[in-house]
Amino acid sequence: MKFKWDEFFVTGDPLILGAQVSIALSTIAIIFVLTYFKKWKWLWSEWITTVDHKKLGIMYIISAVIMLFRGGVDGLMMRAQLALPNNSFLDSNHYNEIFTTHGTIMIIFMAMPFLIGLINVVVPLQIGARDVAFPYLNNLSFWTFFVGAMLFNISFVIGGSPNAGWTSYMPLASNDMSPGPGENYYLLGLQIAGIGTLMTGINFMVTILKMRTKGMTLMRMPMFTWTTLITMVIIVFAFPVLTVALALLSFDRLFGAHFFTLEAGGMPMLWANLFWIWGHPEVYIVILPAFGIFSEIISSFARKQLFGYKAMVGSIIAISVLSFLVWTHHFFTMGNSASVNSFFSITTMAISIPTGVKIFNWLFTMYKGRISFTTPMLWALAFIPNFVIGGVTGVMLAMAAADYQYHNTYFLVSHFHYVLIAGTVFACFAGFIFWYPKMFGHKLNERIGKWFFWIFMIGFNICFFPQYFLGLQGMPRRIYTYGPNDGWTTLNFISTVGAFMMGVGFLILCYNIYYSFRYSTREISGDSWGVGRTLDWATSSAIPPHYNFAVLPEVKSQDAFLHMKEEKTELYPESKFKKIHMPSNSGRPFFMSVAFGLAGFGLVFEWYWMGVVGLIGVLLCMVLRSFEYDNGYYISVDEIKETERKISE
């Protein structure tokens, strides 16, 4: 790639110029605030180097919300372009760039980190653990994700964004058809972030299997913990495939290999297969934790034990197995034999069965329950019908013969947005609001929260339901404009109105965070909603102490904390206080991730010397870690007593 220095910064587009100015001003403002209030040491010692799973979870969530804003703006720009025929708001290349970054950001850099953030905050508390199995690795997982996300996101101001779609199909993603650094940003940003996700999968799988408190058998675990465990198993099996695929395509682009190009025997369809062998399990990586969140919320606010617990566990396991047997349904039209299409059509339909089991379990959990219509519960209730719509249309798409009509139309676009927004995004909002007091010590305002819910949910349906009809009328996806005689103007305009309603809803959420920080009553009991059933509600609010539990609880039933409340069990008797061993903070994961970012940035522009320097930095950090003998530290009994006294005041 012959890179021209005068093209280093993207210029000539007022939207990108505005983004560059806002980034510069935001950076200056952050530096000024940290310097003025003398918070640099606090930022380093309390957040950047922390190994506390709760703080890392909050950092994941903050990053995900920022990515939600970026990906949401991309989506609004696409809808603005398609609102009217022959619109010139975006040119074709800019639209393709936004189309690519929107999909990649929303799935890889928003949905996954949001859920991983909630998992970090909640799951160790739910199983009665002091921290995760590998705290150092947890910090490294976050920073590799964050650096990968930042590497991907700087592409729109430095060098140029990828424009081959979020799936980066070959040969469209080849050097001939996608010259420049954009596609390299995609490959290396995802590679670095994917390493962090794989480490998270290993970490939480070990944590759940080996660090549960006394009495917590597998069949006493909360459903969110169960869905997390199965999700981590999927990650461990699926993400190595993505890692290999990204590496092979990187070799094609950077070193002239031909794994996916027709020259020298390469196979473009091999990329499609490898991508979707990872890609469809990825759908369940972001859906299964959402199922767990809704299970916790519905059970709590219906004030009933989850109906069909064993059936729920079985359905989760069935979904995880079938998720690896459906990938070809993404390209029924791309030359498979009838027998191959038939097999994957059957497996795709079959996966709807365990999903349907869960829907009925949630409905029966609410049956005859004393339901409180709180904001989290509203999101859970909205999820069920909207997700069913997405699921039913998914079964329609699973019919290989019919898919020839639906494929690459807006019918498909509407389907996966009904699944991913109604499933994953609704769950992110519900879980965020539900566990918000656990993280920050106060609830979000319910009145403002309900405005957010109704505007966003109604806007979502106004935006995406018309797209089913656009698809049936033949509107293909990925087009940046259309003619006035195509007959798509009215539905596209309605869809755009709905998209901007969703944007307004997000702004209301941001206002709610500010308003609640200023005016909400501080909550210290830990059981913020008064309906807590699991051990996460047995700890204090506003980031529980690093050690989580002054005394590790003993579990005697499925809804452990509810049982303790009913039995009036003393949670933390001082007579049982013992000194607690905790892991030390470390800054090395941060520096290792920066080295990864340096290597990635160098390889994006094919500056191999910079790539080598960055990789040497990564290796050096690993070597130094190998010679580090840090046995952590102990929290004394007196310190535990003082901490618990302050919590109870």
Swiss-Prot record:
Cross-link (1'-histidyl-3'-tyrosine (His-Tyr)), chain numbering: 280-284
Top-level EC class as recorded in UniProt: oxidoreductase
Family matches, as SUPFAM superfamilies: Cytochrome c oxidase subunit I-like
Binding site for Fe(II)-heme a: 102, 417
Cellular component annotations (GO), alphabetically ordered: plasma membrane
Cofactor: Cu cation; ferriheme a
Primary localisation category: membrane
Pathway the protein takes part in: Energy metabolism; oxidative phosphorylation
Keyword hit for DNA damage: no
Positions on the Extracellular side per record topology: 1-15, 76-97, 158-190, 247-272, 336-343, 398-405, 473-490, 605-610
Cytoplasmic side: 35-56, 118-139, 210-227, 293-315, 363-377, 426-452, 511-584, 632-649
The name this protein goes by in its record: Quinol oxidase subunit 1
Organism: Bacillus subtilis (strain 168)
Gene: qoxB
